[in-house]
Amino acid sequence: MFHRDENVKLWLVSHKSLDTCTQATHTHTCPDCVIPHILNGEANCIISNHSASSSLHSKGYVIVVEVEGDKRSHEVKLFVFGDSYVDTGNSVNSASYKPPSGDTFPGKPAGRFSDGCVLTDYIASYLKIKSPTPYIFRNSSELQYGMNFAHGGSGIFNTSVDGPNMTVQIDSFENLIKEKVYTKADLESSVALVNAAGNDYATFLLRQHGSIQDMPVFTTILIRQMSLNLRRIHSLGINKIAVGLLEPIGCMPLLTVASSYEKCLEPFNLISQNHSQMLLQIVQELNKELGKPVFVTLDLYNSFLSVISTMQKRHSENPTLMNPLQPCCEGVSMEYSCGSVDEKGEKKYCLCKKPELSFFWEGVHLSQNGWYAVYMMLYSSLSKL
């Protein structure tokens, strides 16, 4: 997905002033759909086991159902590769470690590009394990739940952000195996989560001055490398690998601001659609070649669109509910973004009154509620892991 850096502002066609937005405050409590449980002494995102659909629907939540999660033993480990949609702490110098990130969970900035839990947390919760340790903390934290190598702003190839691309992330994983941090048995019972490509497209269009017309060739290059990456992760010993399809990048508030958050930009969504179709085909071919369903796709593209459509319908029926294309957190004017402060340390951003009803946290990343809604759309696919 697109990383928040200053160059990305070149994507904007126009931007109306946000000086009139109010800087609302909210308490540091998790919404009803997610409860931060204590696991081995630390707070962790665990799906609640109660059904509260009626009350939450009245509050504007997208979907809430009772969730049982995976029934396998706690021996399972989760290894994560990709960008900020799945990063839980590796981007130490980023906005993920600055307010208001983490306001909902755990109540302070903790390395997630959201107000709370992200996709990695929910998949770990499904597996009934703690979210895996970020790679930068590999020498000081528990390793029994796996490792998160994902880094905000990274891509399949190098991007405009100084961070490890996916090849380097897999290199780090391989080194841990060589150091016998994880055994063959560890890996055989484990799951990998792979999600990347949005930052590659942003870099291609911005740094390399590419155009949408040039996309088909670039997409082919990305898919070819992703195929190599997936093969490599499997060859290192992991037998179940979840692969995220590309989210509809034309629906990001960073772009929808051009239409006053009224509609997604279809030319950009077409990029995502083509990428996802090609990636799905590659995954199917790999599974056929291996003779078993090693790879499972997580359809972020259609999950995002489904949730957005549902929330837009409810917003049209009840304007007091939040427009899903509008971010919860945004800068007070064009030169600022979520988390910006001036030279005096004063906030130059505003927050929505109810983050628990939002879909996007800021211009690129989802809120905790947004990720929960997407997770529920993906839930049936997780049973294949």
Predicted regions and their residues:
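Conserved SGNH/GDSL esterase-like catalytic core that processes O-acyl groups on lipids
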Residues: G102-R224, L228
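Structural recognition of the beta-strand scaffold that forms the well-ordered cores
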Residues: K77-F81, V86-D87, G146-H151, S190-N195, ...
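Mobile gating loops/cap/lid regions near enzyme active sites that modulate substrate access
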Residues: A95, P248-E266, E285-K288, K292-V364
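Intrinsically disordered, low-complexity terminal segments enriched in Ser/Thr
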Residues: K16, T20-V34
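Signal-peptide-cleavage-adjacent N-terminal segments of secreted and extracellular proteins
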Residues: H57-E142, W361, L366-N369, A373, ...
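Extracytoplasmic, non-cytosolic globular domains
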Residues: A196-A202, R207-I308
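Cleavable N-terminal signal peptides of Sec/SRP-targeted secreted and luminal proteins
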Residues: M1, N44, S48-E68
